[in-house]
Structure formats: C-alpha cells, structure tokens
Amino acid sequence: QSIPQNSHYGTELQYVVDTDASANTYAKSIQDSFNAVGATNLVSYPDTDLADQLKTVARLIRGGIQTKVYMVTIGGFDTHNAQNQGSGDINGRHTDLMNQLSTAVDAFVADINSDTIGDDIIGLTFSEFGRKAIQNGNYGTDHGEIAPMFVFGKPVEGGISGVNVDLTEATSNNNWQLKTVQHDYRQVFATLMQDFLGASD
C-alpha cells in the first residue's frame, strides 16, 4: 500500500515506516556482533541484572560493534527508607546496591582487561540526583543536590579527585543540602568526550 504524499498523515506514516526499517537494521547489527566469532566473555559475572547488562556490553565490543557509548542501569537508589537497617547499622538496601554495583563493575573491568579491548574503554557512573547529608526518620535519605561519581577503566589514573565534603555545610537553614560542587558532572562528561573520544569543542 502506497503512503499518501504531501500530507501530514503521509509524513507521519513515512516516519513510522522509516523508524521500523532502521530498528530492524540496528537489531541485525547487534545480533551479528553478539554472535560473532570471538564475541565471548572471558570471566564469570555475578548473577545480577547490572552484571548481565555489562556482560552483554563486553561481548558486543569484542564482537566488533562500533558503538561509542553504552548506557546500563541499576535502580533502587531512591532510598527514602530502609537505606540501612537501623541506627549505627551500615547494612541495608544501600549496602546491597553498592555491592551489586561494585561486583558487576569488577567483573566487567576484569573481562575487558583480559585482552586489549580494555585499553580503549572508560566507564563512569551517574545519577539524576544525589542525597541529603542527613538521615530522615525512616532510616533513609531524601533527595539531595550533589553525589559522587565513579570513573573506571585502564585509561583512567586511579585515585580520588576532590576532598571530603564539609558536613557542617548541611544545616536546617538550607534543608540539609550540601551545596559546594567540586566537579560539575557536565564538565566530567565534556572532558571524556573531548580528551578520550576526540570530540571537538
């Protein structure tokens, strides 16, 4: 059936058809890379959703796909309650989430560093918001304005950039927020884009 020309309906329908065709093309490319000779994982990964995502990324890269940026996700950090199990107890939901993050990233880094693909890979964490610097009444923390970032990979010079936050900055007058930003996340992204991926200014 032909698509009507010179009409809003026809334009929108053509967009849907083109999008469908592009999705099929991209799906074929992903499938080919995932199933390519040599597209394997060289280490074992934990049995978690985040680890499965990173495991797939490593396999796609080893399979020769040319994608420059991948995004994987882990949910559950909006810890308004049960962030820990009680006063003075560090165990709880936040500890479990950090364990999932660290073990998945550890496996991914070990995998990509098992051969030369790790020479060209940098990973970093980001979130849509941070947490306040005070516990609420439900053993959790509410939305805050700053948060740490983890940057990892063989090209990264390891260490801590910045200094410990000044917790005295968080008071009832500013709703227990830490306001001093040491590294703007946009600048971190820009640095990686320019210095590592070769993007222009």
Which residue stretches match the model-derived regions?
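Hydrophobic alpha-helical bundle architecture
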Residues: 111-117, 123-142, 150
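Feature for exported/extracytoplasmic and membrane-associated proteins, marking the mature portion
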Residues: 1-114, 134, 148-201
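Glycine-rich and small/hydrophobic secondary-structure elements
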Residues: 145
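Residue-level recognition of the N-termini of beta-strands and the immediately preceding loop/turn
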Residues: 68-70, 119-122
